[in-house]
Amino acid sequence: MLRHGKALAREEWLGGDEDRPLDQRGSLQAKRMISIYQAFNIEKVITSDAIRCYDTVEPLTKALDLKLKVEKVISEQSWKKDKELAIEFAKEIIKDERTILVCSHNPVLPRMLEKLTKKIDFDYPDNKLQPGEAWIIHHKKKEVLQIDRLEAPTT
């Protein structure tokens, strides 16, 4: 579970929030993610439909020669309307044994993960990811066994 790279501040963007792009630092983070995430043997990449999420994982997806799947239910706009859609998405994705990268937002990612972690202590500072950070979720048969935090690429 990856939070998108650093985006332009909301105050600096006049368009719709879903169209808010990465800033210079976020674009650099996206490029640097390639060498980091190649080691995980990712088999599928799913992203929110927000431009900043798409642009975060698009370079990696190309480098891995994968198709990028856009999923609206993990967007901030969808989350504000119906939180259960993202929760159901998380419950479905955990059934898949493949290595999948999901790129979305705070508060969506922390709540999705919270619903999946029943038997482990999920207690990271504020239970939030900084831009470009990720949680690596180790699971087997729909049960989360461990969570590791992956720092954002340095810029």
Per-region residue spans from a language model:
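Short, solvent-exposed aromatic-acidic interface loops
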Residues: 148-155
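Predominantly a core beta-strand signature of beta-propeller blades
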Residues: 68, 144-147
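Active-site-adjacent alpha-helix immediately C-terminal to a catalytic or transition-state-stabilizing loop
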Residues: 87-145
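Active-site-proximal alpha-helix that buttresses catalytic centers in soluble enzyme cores
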Residues: 1-81, 110, 122-133, 151
